Amino acid sequence: MIESHEFNDINDSHVGVDINSLESTTSTSASYCATSGGFMNLTLISGHLKQVWVEYDGVKKQINVTLAPINVDKPKIPLLSLSGDLSPIINKAMYVGFSSTTGSILTSHYVLGWSFKMNGKAQEVAILNFPSCLEVKAELNI
């Protein structure tokens, strides 16, 4: 990751929610809520696999973003919560996505699994069905 002062990034290892802008509506340093209840810092450029849950409750108008290492169950407390009505920007057909930047450092970023559900809970992503590259197998101890 890279810190961009142009877009008011808080640091070079953060998670943000950007809505129709490159400037985050809200952001925080990358971390996850451990089972002990405290937040543990994560370094996004560590090379270790991570999983992210992005959830929007249209009734409550609540966006939650939860982050954790790949071998950790979904934390009970999200990393970011944001109240806001997304209905004015959600269309019947549209694109959503993830982005990442590392400045001048050459890196690759992969989305290894994706689950989406309208009006309900998305299915769990089957980690064992991830691509069988060595890095994934080593990280998952399989």
Describe each PLM feature range:
Residues 1-142:
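Polar, low-complexity loop segments and adjacent catalytic/binding residues used for recognizing
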